[in-house]
């Protein structure tokens, strides 16, 4: 179980485990997050260490369409936490909506906060049920639902 390895909870160590090294997780994580930082910089928010400088504060809206796994990588980068607890402890169904906004609590320093995560209210409003595809079996004996 991954939960027995404390490095998986550390934002600087999770990709140094044998399992993550075998899939080049550090390189992929850094590739994705550096491109994300480039996008944010183009919109006026430049990463400096563990925070973002608001060099051109604005109210731009950036819309990203991505897989849950990438969503957790981006959120973990913004929050400086390991993506492992996000991947295993959260669920964003297909077509769900997550809303992140900036707050400039201190002049020139931007914080990112999640206003909603995995919202599916638009599906319910349209009379649709959210997909079970993002989830695993609720009980092990249910052979109709996905198992690990």
Walk through the language-model features, giving the residues of each:
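Generic detector of bulky aromatic hydrophobic side chains
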Residues: 13-19, 67-68, 78, 118
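Short hydrophobic/aromatic-rich motifs at helix boundaries and adjacent loops
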Residues: 8-9, 69-72
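Acidic, low-complexity terminal tails and accessory targeting/binding regions
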Residues: 50-61, 73-148
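Phosphate-handling substructures
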Residues: 1-43
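A mid-sequence, solvent-exposed acidic-amphipathic segment
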Residues: 30-64, 70
């Amino acid at each position: 179980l991954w939960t027995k390895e404390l490095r998986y909870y550390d934002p600087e160590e999770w990709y140094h485990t044998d399992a993550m090294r075998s899939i080049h997780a550090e390189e992929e994580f850094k590739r994705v997050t550096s491109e994300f930082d480039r996008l944010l910089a183009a919109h006026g928010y430049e990463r400096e260490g563990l925070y973002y400088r608001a060099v051109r504060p604005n109210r731009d809206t950036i819309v990203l369409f991505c897989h849950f796994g990438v969503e957790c990588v981006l959120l973990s980068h913004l929050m400086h936490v390991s993506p492992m607890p996000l991947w295993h402890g959260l669920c964003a169904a297909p077509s769900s909506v997550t809303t992140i906004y900036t707050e400039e609590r201190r002049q020139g320093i931007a914080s990112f906060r999640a206003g909603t995560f995995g919202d599916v209210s638009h599906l319910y409003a349209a009379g649709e049920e959210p997909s079970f595809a993002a989830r695993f079996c609720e009980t092990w004996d249910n052979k109709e639902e996905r198992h690990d």
